[in-house]
Amino acid sequence: MPAKKTMAQRLGQALETMTRQCGQLPETPAYGSWLLGRVSESPSRRWVRIKRIVTVYIMTANLTGIVVALLVVTFAFPVPSIYTDAPWWVTFGVAPAYATLALAIGTYWITTRIVRASIRWAIEERAPSQADGRNTLLLPFRVAAVHLILWDIGGALLATLYGLANRVFVTIILFSVTICGVLVATNCYLFTEFALRPVAAKALEAGRPPRRFAPGIMGRTMTVWSLGSGVPVTGIATTALYVLLVHNLTETQLASAVLILSITTLIFGFLVMWILAWLTAAPVRVVRAALKRVEQGDLRGDLVVFDGTELGELQRGFNAMVNGLRERERVRDLFGRHVGREVAAAAERERPQLGGEDRHAAVVFVDIVGSTQLVDNQPAAHVVKLLNRFFAIVVNEVDRHHGLINKFAGDAALAIFGAPNRLDRPEDAALAAARAIADRLANEMPEVQAGIGVAAGQIVAGNVGAKQRFEYTVVGKPVNQAARLCELAKSHPARLLASSDTLHAASETERAHWSLGETVTLRGHEQPTRLAVPT
């Protein structure tokens, strides 16, 4: 029975689903969230997406900040009142007009001028220069700075106008507007950094960011804590100190003020910490999902490096690791192609050493008939193409019957069954593979005739050569016998010959496909050999 999810897990999952942040979603987005689109998205469409995200969040954050500032001024500091103790044209005229004008002009200026100018290189599909990368990484700071300036101007303007009616308003207005402005700027900084991930990824492709533009995880966390929690808590303490000095609030009004400021701190603090956790968790989850794919053997594709902190270095390190694994797999594949998969696997399992061991194995030798005339009468390119088709059939059948292509020698191939990997009945595998090769050559390449010889017995298999250069090979009577049988098979109607000893050692099922023939003395052998041919 699955364990019940905690409240934190449920809240996290709800936020992930609502924002399309990576986590338990079916597929991990390249930039950590589906809100940011795909890597293959066109620059123009990406710009529209970024503009919409930044515009919507700036509008939402500022409207929320304005409402909170109004609540703080109205309920946290009810005396003096902005409705009864101040000119109406300031409360209902100048304040709404400035808020509307600043919100409209600020949003337009940020999205159209500042953001577009900083990422113009990405929209125009140009490679980022050092200045372009610097401007892109500085963009969240500039967005936050514009917000602080506009909020400070508004606070100074309203404090001056309200202060003409009552000097107490100066402290109240400056305090309320400044606190809310800092919180709004912090939120906009973090969310702008999130929205710019696709462009930041392009900038980070050109190189690592300068240290002064990448404060790191600790710097980012401490900054968010200071602005999201430290400043509001300082504001609460300042409020209490102000009341103690001025004595303009009753005990109930002070409690209300502290309560409102505390709730505001909790809400905005939660919001900025959630965005911070969002920004921090996304690169980790992307790397985690990629590691899971690597565990399953998928080495395709690199991660998009979209974070300028140590998390970006983690993404770079993952890409370097995967590149190393891909290179290792490429070398392993090349090694396996050159020496055989089984030999390569054995070399990986244990340190290769010079020497050999006795093995009971079967050997198949395949050689093209009339290869000299073939080379003389055909263009070289045609000969190579024909040999590749020929060897493709041989390799395919040898692999299918669990054998090893030990070497290619011109137009001939030597296959081993039972070394380095042991087989219960190497004779069965070798005889079946030889029959399959002969059948396929007759059907698929009738223009090519090849002799095939099969022999089995005790061989010595191991690494032969020097310490600097050696290769896996087999030596023994069955190897020589298979080569002589192949030579004899070139002039035999069946084109395929095996020794009777090999046939006798095979299973009854495989023997049913063969029949015994004449007895001959092979070249270089003193003892006669009885031949076996396929039926």
UniProtKB/Swiss-Prot annotation:
GO cellular component labels: extracellular region; plasma membrane
Domain HAMP: 279-330
GO molecular function: adenylate cyclase activity
Highest taxon of the lineage: Bacteria
Broad class of the protein's primary localization: membrane
Topology of this chain in the membrane: Multi-pass membrane protein
GO-annotated biological processes: cAMP biosynthetic process; intracellular signal transduction
Assigned keywords, A-Z: Cell membrane, Membrane, Transmembrane, Transmembrane helix
This protein's name: Uncharacterized protein Rv1319c
Family note: Belongs to the adenylyl cyclase class-3 family.
The UniProt record lists the keyword Transmembrane helix: yes
Annotated Guanylate cyclase domain residues: 362-486
TM stretches of this protein: 63-83, 90-110, 143-163, 168-188, 226-246, 258-278
